[in-house]
């Protein structure tokens, strides 16, 4: 009976971890490396308005996802209030979320607006940042994206 209880605890623990990981991947734009923002520093986006690649020497983990920073100072800033530095829409392309789909981003294509940052897809066919910026009704754009994100992040 004790062995059965041990097995049940193990199965529940592993099952919970797998479900948590799957939910994290669905709501956050990460690959199998589990590194957010393709290694770019979330603090650089918000505090400096720059896309800067971080370093694994300055790594912090928040909710099971690793974030890289350019310095120990940036890492300390992040660790004081990590939620502040989370990208909108889990780091997926903001215009894609507006359109109802999740797309990986080009970490150099971003917009900082009202204390938040939005990341965008950029490829040969689509410059999603340009499409986002061309929209006159930003409030409608964000409302629609917010509504779509509630469905897409589940």
Where are these regions (language model features)?
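Intrinsically disordered, low-complexity terminal tails and linkers in eukaryotic proteins, enriched
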Residues: 21-63, 84-154
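Mature extracytoplasmic domains of secretory-pathway proteins
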Residues: 69-70, 74-87, 91
């Amino acid at each position: 009976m004790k062995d059965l209880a041990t097995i049940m605890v193990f199965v529940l623990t592993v099952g919970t971890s797998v479900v948590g990981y799957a939910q994290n991947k669905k709501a956050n734009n990460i690959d199998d490396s589990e590194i957010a923002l393709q290694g770019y520093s979330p603090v650089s986006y918000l505090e400096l308005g720059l896309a800067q690649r971080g370093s694994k020497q300055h790594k912090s983990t928040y909710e099971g996802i690793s974030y890289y920073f350019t310095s120990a100072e940036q890492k300390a800033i992040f660790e004081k209030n990590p939620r502040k530095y989370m990208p909108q829409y889990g780091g997926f392309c903001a215009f894609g979320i507006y359109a109802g789909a999740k797309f990986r981003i080009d970490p150099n294509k971003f917009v900082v607006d009202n204390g938040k940052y939005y990341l965008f897809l950029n490829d040969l066919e689509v410059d999603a940042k340009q499409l986002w910026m061309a929209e006159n009704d930003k409030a409608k754009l964000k409302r629609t994206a917010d509504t779509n994100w509630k469905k897409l992040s589940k």
